[in-house]
Amino acid sequence: MGKRKSKRKAPTKAKAVMPLDTQFNCPFCNHERVCEVKMDREKNVGYISCRVCSEDFQTNINYLSEPIDVYSDWVDACEQANNA
């Protein structure tokens, strides 16, 4: 009498992680992909500026921060300024 064959599952493939954007739409001039983020990890400051209308913003960052975090802080600061 023979032993039953065991069925082995195929190894799962790792899903590719899409990189996050570093260029965003400007909330002031409404141009697409003109705001560029620069992260200064040594000084813990994130800079974002628009190449068209020259608007800029800077905020404090930490070791977990990504460019999208700087952009969202900028949009939140714009909304607070409009509501105040």
Curated annotation (Swiss-Prot):
Which GO CC annotations does the UniProt entry carry? nucleolus; transcription elongation factor complex
Output the GO biological process annotations, alphabetical, semicolon-separated: transcription elongation by RNA polymerase II
Please indicate if the UniProt record lists Mitochondrion as a keyword. Answer: no
Q: Which GO terms describe its molecular function?
A: RNA polymerase II complex binding; zinc ion binding
Which positions bind Zn(2+)?
A: C26, C29, C50, C53
Q: Which UniProt keywords apply?
A: Metal-binding, Nucleus, Transcription, Transcription regulation, Zinc, Zinc-finger
Write down the superkingdom of origin: Eukaryota
Tell me where in or outside the cell this protein is found: Nucleus
* A Pfam entry, by short name: Zn_ribbon_Elf1
Function statement = Transcription elongation factor implicated in the maintenance of proper chromatin structure in actively transcribed regions.
Similarity field: Belongs to the ELOF1 family.
Q: Which PANTHER family match?
A: TRANSCRIPTION ELONGATION FACTOR 1 HOMOLOG
Name of the protein in its database record? Transcription elongation factor 1 homolog
Give the species this sequence originates from.
Caenorhabditis elegans
Q: Give the encoding gene's name.
A: elof-1
